[in-house]
Regions:
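Beta-strand->loop->alpha-helix junctions that form or flank phosphate-binding loops
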Residues: 71-73, 196-197, 209-231, 249-254, ...
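N-terminal accessory interaction module
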Residues: 442-539
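Nucleotide phosphate-binding/pyrophosphate-handling subdomain across enzymes
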Residues: 40, 137, 149-152, 158, ...
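Acidic, Mg2+-coordinating active-site environments of NTP-dependent enzymes
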Residues: 138, 161-247, 261-286
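ATP-dependent carboxylate-amine ligase catalytic core
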Residues: 22-37, 63-154, 173
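Conserved, mostly hydrophobic/aromatic
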Residues: 481, 546, 550
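C-terminal helical cap/extension that packs against the catalytic core
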Residues: 200-204, 208, 345-407
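Short functional linear segments
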Residues: 1-46, 53-66, 110-111
């Protein structure tokens, strides 16, 4: 089984549970000799901020010298991002091994009418890998809720509920209290549950979790303060308890991130107590400062000010608006795309009034129609609202509208952020292909199917570049390269959420035709065209070759 085939199998699994609960994950883990019994776990639940909190907790524990696993969702470029050990993604070989072993059992369960979901299986894969990697502790971000979430198959030594707001009401309940009750179920047996919740949510958590440590800006067991912003993406923070305190910096901004940092400090101290590890203030401060977390008020450019944020519900949008208020900029240009099950009007109402909006559709089957999103903004009083399609084009449109000193903000979903980030993080790699052996090695590394590799290997005699693209962009580039007279080989269709490796080969003339077509089409691939032209040397003043494969 090739890696892309393993990923395709995972992504083809259903997305919604037939039978809520942890029994299915527990049964799958039993096929792997119950690896969850061999690892110390931390669970982080919450409506917002649980990913950031999990990352900060992991960073502090690593700074303490522990081998630490981290499980988060969703991923930006590859499913391997979801499971990491000491910052390194789960290897492709481990993904293949897990799927090869699990597939017969999973197929049999599906045939019996009791299939597992993608999230359940990937959660089991992460837990198995953490045991295989002999981690000292693993931090798990809860997917949804708490009590019935797949991650609750473990018995955590420490756990948190970052906060509670109305979300996933069809599954979790119609009130904050109902949702809080389900999230409180992650409470560990021997440590207080840590929470940044307030009001009715906190009262409910106290009723159902027993002992609780509260973290907040006022009237809490652990008090936090967000200090001055040091840079666009770093701020000072203080965390003060009765017998310890931390004065440091975090690579995240906003009062809510200060609360998350406080929760992470308490969790890390609880784990250290359980494992008998020393954890002083200096270690906490150093760990927090290394906890970079993409897609959370991530500044991509400073003039115009371009920000990507995964705010995906009204509460997160309200927090984002508060952070924005601390920045000086001219006009505000929004790029907005969200899933269909969100409260779009409440999200829009929580945001500052925009000067322009481009509504778009992330490449996900749950994405809301951009026409619907545009109408929501119009009904809320926005004047300049444009209906776009793909995220890349929407970002390009908003950026073209922005003058110096303006702000471009892309938000609404982490799926949107994942696609938007490609504008800045995409790499086009020149490859030195001297002979058939080099071509074979390249195509194998790119996970190109055997038949396509055999055809492409014979043609890899000109310039060769490798890049990773979203699924629909990969299809567009493939068709354009073939039309241009070049050759293109892609990894098997891994599906939504997984970038496809694309290997292009051809003469300079073929690359010229390809990039000219991509730049002219309205598919948001003009930036890709520019990167490819630069990579193969088409923009060299002397017209000569760049240092690429020949």
């Amino acid at each position: 089984m090739q890696y892309h085939e393993a990923v395709r199998f995972l992504l083809d699994l259903r997305r919604f549970q037939v039978k809520p609960g942890t029994e299915s994950v527990r049964s799958l883990l039993a096929e792997f000799d119950d690896p969850h019994e061999d690892v110390t776990f931390v669970q982080v639940a919450g409506s917002n901020g649980k990913g950031s909190t999990a990352r900060m907790t992991e960073a502090v524990l690593r700074e303490a010298g522990l081998t630490v696993g981290l499980y988060t969702s969703p991923h930006f470029e590859t499913v391997r991002e979801r499971a990491r050990v000491d910052g390194r993604k789960i290897p492709e070989s481990a993904v293949r091994e897990f799927v090869e072993r699990a597939k017969p059992w999973l197929v049999e369960r599906a045939a019996e009418g009791d299939p597992l979901t993608f999230f359940e299986v990937v959660t089991a894969m992460a837990i198995w890998y953490f045991a295989e990697a002999e981690t000292d502790v693993a931090v798990l971000e809860v997917g949804m809720g708490g009590k019935l979430d797949a991650t609750s198959v473990v018995d955590p030594v420490a756990a948190a509920v970052t906060n509670v707001s109305l979300e996933h009401t069809a599954v979790l309940g119609d009130t904050v209290a109902e949702i809080a009750e389900k999230k409180a179920a992650v409470a560990p047996a021997n440590q207080p549950l840590v929470t940044g919740a307030t009001g009715d949510a906190l009262a409910t958590i106290r009723d159902h979790a027993g002992s609780v440590v509260t973290v907040g800006t006022d009237d809490a067991d652990v008090t936090v303060r967000a200090g001055e912003r040091v840079t666009h993406q770093e701020s000072a923070v203080s965390v003060v308890a009765d017998d310890w305190r931390v004065e440091g910096r975090i690579p995240l901004v906003g009062d809510y991130q200060a609360v998350n940092a406080g929760i992470a400090c308490v969790l890390a101290r609880q784990v250290a107590d359980e494992l008998g590890v020393a954890l002083d203030a200096t270690t906490l401060e150093r760990g927090l400062r290394t906890a970079h977390w993409p897609g959370r008020f991530e500044v991509m450019e400073t003039d115009p000010f371009v920000v990507l944020d995964g705010a995906h519900n009204p509460s997160a949008c309200e927090s984002l608006a508060t952070v924005l208020d601390d920045f000086d900029f001219g006009a505000l240009h929004l790029v907005f795309g969200a899933m269909h099950d969100k409260d779009h009007r409440a999200m829009v109402d929580a945001l500052p009034d925009p000067d322009s909006v481009v509504a778009c559709r992330p490449d996900n089957p749950r994405s809301e129609d951009p026409e619907t999103l545009a109408r929501v903004f119009e009904n809320a009083g926005a004047d300049d609202v444009t209906v776009g399609d793909d995220v890349a084009s929407a970002v390009a449109t908003a950026s073209e509208r922005a003058d110096e000193g303006d702000c471009v903000l892309a938000l609404g979903s982490l799926f949107l952020v994942a696609e938007a980030r490609q504008t800045w993080t995409r790499t086009v790699t020149p490859v030195d292909v001297r002979d058939r052996t080099d071509a074979t090695d390249l195509l194998e590394r790119a996970h190109v199917a055997d038949r396509d590799a055999a055809e492409a290997r014979e043609e890899c005699v000109h310039r060769v570049v490798r890049l990773s693209l979203q699924r629909r962009d990969a299809r567009t580039v493939t068709e354009a390269m073939l039309t241009a007279g070049g050759d293109c080989a892609t990894a098997g269709d891994a599906g939504n959420g997984e970038l496809a490796d694309v290997v292009l080969s051809g003469t300079l003339a073929a690359f010229d035709r390809l990039t000219t077509r991509l730049a002219a089409d309205s598919d948001g691939l003009a930036a890709v065209a520019a990167d490819v032209r630069a990579c193969v040397g088409l923009d060299c003043d002397a017209g000569g070759d760049a240092d690429v494969g020949t």
